[in-house]
């Protein structure tokens, strides 16, 4: 839930107007909107490159994943792995745009560890893949933009670790 929604829900629950502090936080959120949209657009426009680079780095660091018997062995399974990386990259953009981790939690993190465990997928390899996504994506961003996006990647990595 965005800071705007949270503030309104809290104020309404207490049957009051938004406080000066809440209004200031909303103002800060709105002012940062252009930056958040720019970050998400940069990532979205470069997603194929980011995912490919992250996948290549992951497979170099974790050759067991693409070796016979590995979860990404073979063309179809490698494509599935890259699809999953793209999914996490997309979730990060949702977090960036909303300025909140809620979309990441609600859409893609709840139950993910159990799912990967049931599939026999090494969760640490998935987390490493997201680390590589972070590296590739933040290299395209500068300063505060990289820090902003990096925080959402870190949240996903933490949830997977």
UniProtKB/Swiss-Prot annotation:
(2R,3E)-phycocyanobilin binds at residue 81. One of its GO terms (biological process) is photosynthesis. Contains one covalently linked phycocyanobilin chromophore. It comes from the Bacteria. The modification N4-methylasparagine is found at residue 71. GO terms for cellular component: phycobilisome; plasma membrane-derived thylakoid membrane. Keywords: Antenna complex, Bile pigment, Chromophore, Electron transport, Membrane, Methylation, Photosynthesis, Phycobilisome, Thylakoid, Transport. Belongs to the phycobiliprotein family. Light-harvesting photosynthetic bile pigment-protein from the phycobiliprotein complex. Allophycocyanin has a maximum absorption at approximately 650 nanometers. Its main location: membrane. It comes from Synechococcus sp. (strain ATCC 27144 / PCC 6301 / SAUG 1402/1) (Anacystis nidulans). InterPro entries: Globin-like_sf (IPR009050), Phycobilisome_asu/bsu (IPR012128), Phycobilisome_asu/bsu_sf (IPR038719). It is a peripheral membrane protein. It holds the Pfam family Phycobilisome. Heterodimer of an alpha and a beta chain. This is Allophycocyanin alpha chain. It is found in: Cellular thylakoid membrane.
């Amino acid at each position: 839930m965005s800071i705007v929604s949270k503030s309104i829900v809290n104020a309404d629950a207490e049957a009051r107007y938004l406080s000066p502090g809440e209004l200031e936080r909303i103002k800060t959120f709105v002012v940062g909107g252009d930056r958040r949209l720019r970050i998400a657009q940069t990532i979205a426009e470069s997603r194929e490159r980011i995912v490919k680079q992250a996948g290549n780095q992951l497979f170099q660091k974790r050759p067991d994943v693409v070796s016979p018997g590995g979860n990404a062995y073979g063309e179809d399974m490698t494509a599935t792995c890259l699809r999953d990386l793209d999914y996490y990259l997309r979730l990060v953009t949702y977090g960036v745009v909303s300025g909140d981790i809620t979309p990441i939690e609600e859409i893609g993190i709840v139950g993910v560890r159990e799912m990967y465990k049931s599939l026999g997928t090494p969760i640490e390899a998935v987390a490493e893949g997201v680390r590589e996504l972070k590296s590739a994506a933040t290299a395209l961003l500068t300063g505060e933009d990289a820090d902003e996006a990096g925080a959402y990647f870190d949240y996903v990595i933490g949830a997977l670790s």
